[in-house]
Amino acid sequence: APECGERASGKRCPNGKCCSQWGYCGTTDNYCGQGCQSQCDYWRCGRDFGGRLCEEDMCCSKYGWCGYSDDHCEDGCQSQCD
């Protein structure tokens, strides 16, 4: 049964996870990408997203994406860079 969104009476996912077009919670592009119903910016951060910090202490890259790679945590990193 759907966990969130229209098919679940508008319920939101826990821990800021995205609600997919099919009503399931997750954090990958399948949930947060096209058709996402709510909390679709889970992987987004930084100045273009109201200064939002990443979940789980991930780094915020210069392009506003959350992750743990050197591309996220080094040159131009916006927050939680160490």
UniProtKB/Swiss-Prot annotation:
What InterPro entries does this protein map onto? Chitin-bd_1, Chitin-binding_1_CS, Endochitinase-like_sf
- Note the SS bond partners: 4-19, 13-25, 18-32, 36-40, 45-60, 54-66, 59-73, 77-81
Keywords on record = Chitin-binding, Disulfide bond, Lectin, Mitogen, Repeat
Q: Where on the tree of life does the source sit, at the highest rank?
A: Eukaryota
Q: Which SMART domains match?
A: ChtBD1
Q: Does the keyword Ubl conjugation apply?
A: no
Chain sites annotated for binding a carbohydrate: 20, 22, 24, 31, 43, 61, 63, 65, 72
GO BP annotations of the record are: positive regulation of cell division; positive regulation of mitotic nuclear division
Give one Pfam family, short name only: Chitin_bind_1
Tell me yes or no: is Glycoprotein among this UniProt entry's keywords: no
Give residue ranges for domain Chitin-binding type-1: 1-42, 43-82
Q: Which GO terms describe its molecular function?
A: carbohydrate binding; chitin binding
Q: How does it assemble?
A: Monomer.
What's its job? N-acetyl-D-glucosamine binding lectin. Shows no hemagglutinating activity towards rabbit erythrocytes and weak activity towards trypsin-treated erythrocytes. Has mitogenic activity towards human peripheral blood lymphocytes (HPBL).
Task: Return the protein name.
Answer: Lectin-D2
What organism does this protein naturally occur in? Phytolacca americana
